[in-house]
A protein has these predicted regions:
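Surface-exposed amphipathic alpha-helical tracts and adjacent flexible/coil segments at the periphery
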Residues: 1-178
Length: 178
């Protein structure tokens, strides 16, 4: 049993990650994939679904470089060490994890309105400021694009330098269609 400021943990299992073995699973007759989204953030679910969707859509032409790019996407969200479980026998006999989840990126905002070519309505989830760089997670061509926060306004049109109010709705100025 472990405890920290976020809660008590009795049995923490490693996170299953089969993204580099999807072709093998398909060849074995698997025709449907499921991710574990229970007790996960919307950012986690969106990021994992996005990575797996890209892998599935490109399954017949996956290169080692593209698989590594997708694996790099998966480590951005909060996760424990990865395992392939018992898919390949008992090589990874220790499925329990005693360390805490890690992540390299934070979920900053959710796009909630259409872009007008100059700005887009967002709902803030974590603090960021003018001058910060944000990476876009999207199912379209803006996937992985970096935008620099040049200007923000609240819904009254007032200038905002620091998005620090939880779930505040702001207009983020960007020429990138989001």
């Amino acid at each position: 049993i472990q405890e920290d400021e976020r809660g008590t943990y009795i049995l923490n299992s490693k996170d299953l990650n089969m993204i580099e073995h999807l072709k093998e699973l398909k060849d074995a007759g698997v025709n449907s994939f499921k991710i574990e989204g229970r007790m996960k953030s919307p950012y986690y679910v969106a990021n994992v679904v996005n990575a797996y969707r890209r892998a599935i859509d490109n399954m017949d032409s996956l290169t080692p470089e593209y698989i590594q790019e997708l694996k790099n996407e998966l480590i951005k969200t909060s996760h424990r060490k990865y395992t392939t479980g018992f898919y390949f026998g008992a090589d990874d006999k220790e499925c329990l994890e005693s360390t805490y989840p890690v992540q390299t990126h934070e979920f900053m905002a959710l796009v909630i309105g259409d872009s007008d070519g100059q700005k887009v309505l967002i709902e803030q989830r974590n603090r960021f400021k003018v001058g910060d760089e944000l990476e876009v997670l999207s199912p379209n061509d803006t996937f992985n694009k970096i935008i620099k926060v040049e200007k923000m306004e609240n819904e009254l049109g007032e200038d905002v330098q620091d998005a620090k109010n939880v779930q505040e709705r702001l207009y983020l100025y960007t020429k990138l269609p989001l």
